[in-house]
């Protein structure tokens, strides 16, 4: 395994989690659905904890949390852009549309976040023994939460759009009702939505 590339992944993970905190803070301001707002408030607290967990990885393996990398700068730019998109929607769109923009921005942020943790899972299988325990412990604390953030919010985005289009929506979405934690579970929940109308 290439150590420079592993470090790059870790720097991007930290930046993604830090940006995720700002994404959730802004998304909560956009939320008009009380259930969604509560969900995102929970995810904000979890994401703040994820920042701490990744910081502990850095401390454990001797990385500087303040170091810059080209990839980290790009991740920060993407996160800032998602926040800016939500701020534009808040200032200029109807509340229901701003809420949809927020859900889409959360899905975009969580897609990168989910990938980071999935890659760390792959790294863990090949990691040196002194890193393996650190990575496994972090993965165990975060994995289910990351799955929930992505799959549940994707369900919210879909159902909010359906409602916005004037069609019957399932609120909360099936992904949340069925508490899905896998892509297969999310696909099954999506298929079952018509039965929940």
Predicted segment positions?
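A short structural micro-motif
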Residues: 16, 46-50, 141-145
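Preference for long, well-ordered alpha-helical segments
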Residues: 102-193
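Conserved alpha-helical segments that form or flank metal/cofactor-binding pockets of metalloenzymes
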Residues: 35-83, 153-156
């Amino acid at each position: 395994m290439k150590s420079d590339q592993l470090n790059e992944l870790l720097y991007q993970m930290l930046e993604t989690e830090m940006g995720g905190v700002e994404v959730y803070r802004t998304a909560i301001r956009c939320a008009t659905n009380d259930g969604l707002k509560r969900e995102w408030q929970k995810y904000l607290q979890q994401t703040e904890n994820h920042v701490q967990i990744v910081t502990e990885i850095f401390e454990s393996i001797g990385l500087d949390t303040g170091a810059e990398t080209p990839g980290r700068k790009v991740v920060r730019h993407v996160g800032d852009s998602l926040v800016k998109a939500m701020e534009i929607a808040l200032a200029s769109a109807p509340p229901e549309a701003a809420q949809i923009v927020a859900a889409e921005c959360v899905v975009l942020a969580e897609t990168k976040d989910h990938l980071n943790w999935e890659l760390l899972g792959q790294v863990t299988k090949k990691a040196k023994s002194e890193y393996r325990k650190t990575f496994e412990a972090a993965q165990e604390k975060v994995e289910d939460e990351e799955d929930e953030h992505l799959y549940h919010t994707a369900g919210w985005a879909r159902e909010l759009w359906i409602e916005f289009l004037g069609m019957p929506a399932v609120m909360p979405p099936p992904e949340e009702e069925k508490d899905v934690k896998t892509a297969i579970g999310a696909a099954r929940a999506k298929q079952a939505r018509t039965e929940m109308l």
